[in-house]
Design a protein with these regions (language model features):
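Active-site neighborhood of HAD-like aspartate-dependent phosphohydrolases
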Residues: 1-46
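Alpha-helix N-cap/helix-initiation sites
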Residues: 16, 20, 34, 57, ...
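A metal-dependent, Asp-based hydrolase signature
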Residues: 42-90, 100, 104-107
């Protein structure tokens, strides 16, 4: 049985500020009382530690959520704005780019590669083609509803691939700890944390500021999942199969 590699999209496979700024602009269009949101998000992306209100934001999307909630924007409007912004990627990808060496890293792995994203399907094919990975993803799960939807999704993958009794054969890779890593840890899966802003929100088997820094560890896991988990134990006091709950995105 091949191991299963679960990959996040935004902030993990897809870098660049255009999508999140498009999301902020869509909120401003739908809710004029949120004027100034995009400018504040741009400032956060330029200097993540400058705004005390956003010290816990792990990426631009969480910054948008926190700021828009403060401005009185409700979840339904945010979700609508998000869907509009993702559809616009079919027209303009802006500065979106793949991490260095992504296609080569994925192509050499003997693993079932699953993309799991909160994004809708609209605009996704164009985006994956632009990133050079359209033919390197074996399965796509959209509208995943992370964080709440991640655990049942992972349980399904473990069952579907016959590895429920050996969950270390599934590696979850992502940049939002509550969304991609906490649910995986609860199930005993392997984890790789792309901690872009060095927030250190929770434990993981391996952690780095960028995905390319994690390529060697991902290759190591794909070759020998059980040995990988033994070689990269979780921090003392954090046994596998537990996680501290933290709210994630509502999109």
């Amino acid at each position: 049985m091949r191991p299963v590699l679960v990959l996040d999209l935004d902030g993990t496979l897809a870098l660049g500020d255009a999508p999140v700024l498009g999301y902020a602009r869509a909120i401003e269009t739908l809710a004029p009382y949120a004027d100034g949101l995009t400018a504040t998000v741009e400032a956060f992306l330029a200097e993540p530690g400058a705004d005390a209100r956003l010290r816990n934001a792990q990426d631009g999307y969480q910054a948008v959520q926190m700021l828009s909630e403060e401005l009185g924007v409700d979840g339904a409007l945010r979700n609508h704005a998000y869907a509009l912004s993702r559809a616009s990627l079919d027209v303009d990808l802006g500065d979106v780019r793949a991490p260095s060496g992504l296609a080569a890293a994925l192509s050499e792995l003997d693993a079932h590669r699953v993309l799991v994203t909160n994004s809708p399907r609209d605009g996704l094919d164009t985006l994956l083609g632009h990133l050079g990975v359209a033919d390197l993803v074996d399965e796509i799960r959209t509208d995943a509803g992370k964080p709440r939807g991640m655990r049942p999704l992972l349980v399904g993958l473990l069952d579907d691939h016959g590895i429920a009794a050996d969950p270390a054969r599934l590696l979850s890779v992502g940049d939002i700890w509550a969304n991609e890593l906490a649910p995986a840890l609860e199930l005993g899966c392997a984890t790789a944390y792309v901690d872009t802003f060095d927030r250190q929100q929770g434990p993981a088997h391996v952690r780095a500021r960028t995905l390319p820094e994690l390529y060697p560890a991902i290759r190591e896991w794909a070759r020998h999942p059980a040995e990988f988990v033994r070689a990269h134990p979780l921090p003392a006091g954090v046994p596998a199969g537990t996680a501290t709950e933290r709210p994630g995105l509502d999109i």
